[in-house]
Amino acid sequence: MLDVGFGELFCFGIIALLVLGPDKLPVAARFAGRWYARIKRYISNIQNEIDRELNLSEFRKEMQDELDRLHTLEQTMQARLKEIEKASTEKIAEQPKQPIESEPSITPQKYIFCITPQTIVPFCHQKQHYQQPERYNDLVLESSSVELKIAV
């Protein structure tokens, strides 16, 4: 990284020994080693962040490519759908117009509920052969039309 050879490192050590002396040289070497480790760690972190950003940018590019592909696919599907709609309207227009046969009118069926002492019985069309208790006399029996609708 710094292109320092063994000879240059040896010269640097001798100069440091002469300037600092044997007492302060170990403390200075420890201090320089800590700073070297910190700088190396910072450089490593920066390289990792750059690698992550590059991977993230590659991922973003891949995602954008996929979105573009999906957009193109959606456009082709829309075009095909329009072609199908156009063909179906043309086919309907080509068919001769026939009068629509009216369906027989369906009258809603009326449900009549008869009250027996035990249960309420639907579709009871026969008269009851029993005497209703007093508590059922106040109850008004009504018939109503019921339409069934199915939601799809």
From Swiss-Prot:
Return one GO MF term. protein transmembrane transporter activity
Q: How does it sit in the membrane?
A: Single-pass membrane protein
Membrane spanning residue stretches: 1-21
Q: Which InterPro entries match?
A: TatA/B/E (IPR003369), TatB (IPR018448)
Identify the main location: membrane
Q: How does it assemble?
A: The Tat system comprises two distinct complexes: a TatABC complex, containing multiple copies of TatA, TatB and TatC subunits, and a separate TatA complex, containing only TatA subunits. Substrates initially bind to the TatABC complex, which probably triggers association of the separate TatA complex to form the active translocon.
State the protein's name.
Answer: Sec-independent protein translocase protein TatB
